[in-house]
Amino acid sequence: MKLSNELFHRSSKDHGGKSRICLDSSEDTYPPHSSSPPSFQKRLSFSDFSTTRLFSPPFLSKRSNNSPHRFSYSPPQHPASINSRRVASYTVQSSPSRTTYRQLPNEPQNSAAYTTYSSFPNALFDDFSPNNPLDTDPFLTSPGNKQNTVDSFRPLPETPVSPGGSLVHPLPRPPLPSSVSSHSSPYSTTSSTSLYSLYNDISLSCSPEPYLPLSPTRSPARTPSPIRLYSSDALRPQSPLSPSVEYLTPPNPYSLKSDISSTRQLPKIPVQDYASGKISSPLITRTHRRAQSETLFSSCREPWLVGKLYKWCKEEVFTALGGLVHEGVSRREVAQVMATLFTIHIASMEFLIAEIIAKNILGDWINYGLVEVINLEKLQIAFTSNEPPSGSGVLPFLTNGGCYSYICRSRSCPSKYQCYSCRCARNSSLEFTSLPGQSSDTWSIFWNISSLNSLPSSLSKREIARQNNIHELICKESDYVADLNTLAELFRDGIVQQQDAIVPSNRVADFIQSVFGNVESIRQLHSRLFLPQLIMRERLQGPVVSIIGDILLEWIHAAKSSYINYAKQFPLADETYKLECQRNTYFARWLAACRSDPRCRRLDFQHFLQRPTQRLQRYTLELDTILKHTEQSSWDFQLITQAVKELRATCEECDAVIATVLEANRIRDLSYQLLFKNHESVNLELRDPEREFFFEGIVQRRSDSRLDWLDIHLFLLDNYLIMAKARKDKRTNASRYVVSKRPIPLDLLVLSPKMDDFQLKSNTNKFLGSLAGNLPQESLTTKSKRKSKVNLELMFDATAEKNNENSMNSAVFEKSQLYPFTIRHLGAYTASYTLYVESLQLRKLWVEKINVAKKRHSQKINIKNPFALKVVSDVAFQYPPSDLVNGNEPLNSFNEITLVEGSSIDRALNEVAWKHPIVSEELLPEPIAYGDISCIAQFNDYEGHVSVLIATSTGIFLGAFGDSSDIRDWKKISSQRRVTQLGVVEEFDILLELRDKTLYAHKLSRIIEMGLIESKIAVVIGTPHAVSFFKIGKLSEGASVKRERTLVFYKEGLGNTTTIICCEPVIGLGHNYQKTYAFKRKDVTSFRTLDDFHVTANCHSIDCFKYSIALCHNKGIDVLRLDPKLAVGFPSPSVLNDTLFRNRINNSKPLGVFRIHDPSLFACCYQFGAVFVNGEGSMVNKECWFDWIGKPNSVTSCHGYLIAFNDEFVEIWNTRTRKLNQIIQGNDIKYYPSNSDWLANGKYIMFGMVHPQYHDRHLILALNKAKTNSFIIED
């Protein structure tokens, strides 16, 4: 790709009354010089334009052909003769809406119609007169003067050249009258030390010229293009400014919503009104901050003086933008204000050029310490306390109204001639024309730099490589913009503008929106903002570009949202166009025909559609290359580093967005493709917008007969793992998947940590199709196909196989290897599946994906969990040595349930790790007890804290439970063994202990004081060695006067005939009611038996209510009322009349009866599920029941939830909605009841399991009610 280097060279040509400036024009106003120019040894710098010099035309001077700035004119080429190589050209066109200095020959001269308000600084002084002889160019005569029309095409004089060959600039204007200060005039001949005179003695590699619009002089052939990108249109306001408005909120100068063919409409207002502050600027006022631009711009009447400009920006602009020293203001906003000031003083200057120059000025101020960067990420700057040196120089492009030509700045009537200066800022108008290109010149060829010039020798190899990289970035960006134009104009507009309907009219609008919806925003962003700024930066600073990171950083800030939106829609666009190709053959043929268009370069539509996503990734590579050749001490290095960082973050976000959309599309497809056998169905919740798709693939599984291999399509979602078999629909040939096994919820999915080595695939062998674990000594060499006869062949001898192992075909050997992994389905549908994949890497990938899915699922449901877990004890209690396998494993590793990251148990352990860290397994604290934990009791101590009693096979231990307690501080208070049950009656200061089937009553306060249980002074309740269990409850009695009584129920007897005895504590004489340890100290001397009940069944649990108790036995549930004495079966016979419930209840063990959220309803819990009945035992409706996920051993109720405990998991159900809310997985789970349905400050549900990290230790947990739950019900 070739880029034009003559941005500021102009020629004029008339086209039907319109003025056009084109590099290809054959009617150049200024013919080339015939004399050979002298040698030009060095590149122009600011030393050539000191404070006492004005602009001279360096590109029209006599220079040698070896000069890097040599200029050559080429005749216009016919379009047919233009090289077909893909090039990109940039032409310059004047804006038709702007006032000009030309008069067409056939138009009458009208001074009123062609009144031009001078925009150079002298127009502000009273003594300025356009008729002043000093303001007239002696070599150009106005066309209005008929006496001089013959000399109108007279060439301009050559720039004077000194005898030594160096360029000599024209003499400056004579000084102004003494009444005008020399500092206020741009023509003052007083020399002073300039800030920019530092460029005079610095080498070219360290002296960028950010303000000189230098450009190379080579002019390659240009190809006209219908694609025009008006950069100036996007950078200026689109509507005229109303002078009557005092405060304005203008459109963004970088707005991308303007029409592409519109031009910048400047207000027809004299520039003096801007400078005097009579009206407001259209670019300075922000939406949330009103700044009076009349005061702001009128305070800077001499913007060409660098010192005055810096003072104005520091004192006026920084304050007007609301900047704070510690926060700063946006560099872009300051640059826009400065650019607005420049365009006010030079009304015809392009805003893009003015803004780039303003940014270059700010960059130099940063380098010299006058401005500091507060926030590099947002490019926030602040002005320092440093001041520029006196006489810090001028800005030549603002002097003399933007041009040093007298006739250009002084004539008040229009002229048909362009200004001869290639750097005239008054006639700068940009129009970029771009065509795709296949090749590009290097930086040295582009700037016509040869090895004979002094420039390459003054630059290091690293800097030369950097300049090549920057130029390559601009070339590729031009190609990218051309491809975006092709996508928008050839394909999108072609579909709409085609006479024959390519896409049916009823869906063409949706098609355009789905495929091309976000193309235009990216196209406008690059063609109107990013690419023009890159080209302008290269022209203004070239051939050595000193800084480019600021443009990149501002671009990525503006482009981030557009690319994310494009990435979000890209999967839909790709799917839509492919579907249209399948069902619309005319559209497919049209796309194929478009490939012959030169703009397509034989590339298909898919290439252009995915161009933005691919280009975004390639930016990082190109910027990394530029960064590698950039000095780390430079400011540009910091800017590019920040741009690369944000670019990579944008790429990652785009990848995540695309992945999310692809997952959503795949889930949508699965909702139509999944089929269940035998009309079975599981609600997979595929319509849930939060559903996530993680992975899918084909695995193999042995058939139930273990004779065949089955291909299983595995789908991994964030809630289920689905195993299905692929099937083709015979009618539509669409893919369908028949679910072969019941989908596994991730809450019930267990991935076995133990994985065998690879196995050899074989259909049958003499062991009925079993697979060998490693390299087999005997294995089958042939496979039997399904429904074929079994072929048993001779086995290889082990020795022969070992000898021939190296000579085996590795491809065949690898193909027969399979790598297994095992998954388990917990619950009522418990099952284990061993799946096989073809490689070790694929097995690792599946394991990783399953763990990630379980982690993500745990994180999503954590906020919905009604209970959190608190650790009561982590490593204090150890399993008995007889239970340990291999020294330290108390469980089968094959059935082990591993810890899931982000689960409730993982969060509880992480919370403990902060307070009680364990550095390594070698530093694990020693256990305080060995043996199984039989029971746990809890009570409130004298400070109101919860204390816990834990009975093991080696004794009883006392500890504290709470946020401030030490979970490893346990005190042994008894060495008695065979303790099976503990209970506390806080009101009577009693601890009940069931040991060796004998029920003992101890004084709790004495145990706490002594730290020891004294068995000799304990009170025995009931018949020794005959008590099976006990239960503590508080019941009410009496019809008129309600009185609560604390009762103790215990069971005596064995076999089918048992007796339930009810007793209460008896308080002896001399009791006192002093509150000690939060107990009412009532000296209980004995227990009095109140009543007994004979049950002709084996009773195993008792549940107490306000007026009655429920007895659970092997024949069902009986409810006994104490006053009056009455027993009734529960639930009522009406429920048992239903065959469904009768079979379920009769074949299931009752686990308890609990009051739920509604006080009038009770939950009768069995091993199969729960049935909700009223006080009479009747069901409210047929839907008042549910089945457990597993087969629980015990059930309890807490805060309106039913909690069922299984050996491998805990399931928590909401009694209001009858839905499963939480599942907690674990190994060897055991529930430890409190043996009391009433405690003073409530009760905690405590249970234990094998520690998931240290398998020889007990982990005791307590359910803690979450604060986010909507209701709390006390039992």
UniProtKB/Swiss-Prot annotation:
Q: Where in the cell is the protein located?
A: Cytoplasm
User: What are the recorded GO MF terms, alphabetically?
Assistant: guanyl-nucleotide exchange factor activity; lipid binding
- Please note every region of biased composition (Basic and acidic residues): 7-17
Locate the PH domain: which residues?
A: 692-855
Q: Where is the composition biased (Polar residues)?
A: 32-42, 80-113, 142-151
InterPro entries for the chain? CNH_dom, DBL_dom_sf, DH_dom, PH-like_dom_sf, PH_5, PH_domain, Rho-type_GEFs
Keyword set for this entry? Cell cycle, Cell division, Cytoplasm, Guanine-nucleotide releasing factor, Phosphoprotein, Septation
User: Where is each DH domain found?
Assistant: 465-657
This entry carries the following GO cellular component terms, namely:
cell division site; cell periphery; cytoplasm; cytosol; division septum; medial cortex; mitotic actomyosin contractile ring; mitotic actomyosin contractile ring, intermediate layer
Task: List GO BP terms, alphabetically.
Answer: division septum assembly; positive regulation of mitotic division septum assembly; regulation of cell wall organization or biogenesis; regulation of mitotic division septum assembly; small GTPase-mediated signal transduction
Q: Which residues form the CNH domain?
A: 930-1239
Q: What is its main location?
A: cytoplasm
Q: Pfam families, from UniProt?
A: CNH, PH_5, RhoGEF, WH_RGF3
Signal peptide positions on this chain: none
Positions carrying Phosphoserine are S293
Q: Which SUPFAM superfamilies match?
A: DBL homology domain (DH-domain) (SSF48065), PH domain-like (SSF50729)
Q: Would I find Cell cycle among this entry's keywords?
A: yes
Region (Disordered) residue spans: 1-42, 56-113, 131-188, 214-248
Q: In terms of domain of life, where is this protein from?
A: Eukaryota
Positions with biased composition (Low complexity)? 178-188, 214-228
> Which CDD domains would you find in this protein's record?
RhoGEF (cd00160)
Q: Gene3D superfamilies annotated for this entry? A: Dbl homology (DH) domain, Pleckstrin-homology domain (PH domain)/Phosphotyrosine-binding domain (PTB)
Question: Which purpose does this protein serve, as stated in its record?
Answer: Stimulates the exchange of Rho1 GDP-bound form into GTP-bound form. Regulates, via interaction and activation of Rho1, beta-1,3-glucan biosynthesis and cell wall integrity during septation. Involved in the regulation of contractile ring assembly.
Can you say what this protein is called?
Rho1 guanine nucleotide exchange factor 3
